[in-house]
Amino acid sequence: MNIDQMSERLQKILMDAINLAKSNQHPSVDTVDMLETIFKDDVLDGLFERIGLDKGRALQMVQQESNHIAKSSTSNINLSNEVQKSFEDAQNWASQHDETYLSVASVFLALLFNRSYISKELVRTFNLNKDACYKAELERRNGKKFDTPNSEENVEALKKYGRDLV
């Protein structure tokens, strides 16, 4: 995992997840830490809408699960095996789509369909299908490739910041 190959937004999400795990005294950055940080951000709101995921409800589920993680006093925090594997899966997907930078969306989708309990619960609760979610992400991108560190900021920018001038 190379931080220089991550979008600026993903770098921020990762740092926020590390800080969240530390503040919650988790022994490692786990799927719940990554998902909580992603759900607190607005970068994927368009994807959540497309796949029918209620961000508020999902955030509640993740926070409840986070309370069940054992506490640790370690100051040297690493990524859990599930999160590492999710980053690898996301990188593979990004490579298949000729992308230079790893995005929050590709990591989110890999996290969503990893083997963690919370991921399985989210998939079950919101009746999510892996192929449909990846297809929704490709549609959201509308053919855009993530080839600069801030490419992610431009996806759905018109919808987010634009207004009808007519």
Language model: regions and residue ranges:
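Histone-fold recognition with a strong bias for associated Lys/Arg-rich disordered tails
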Residues: 1-166
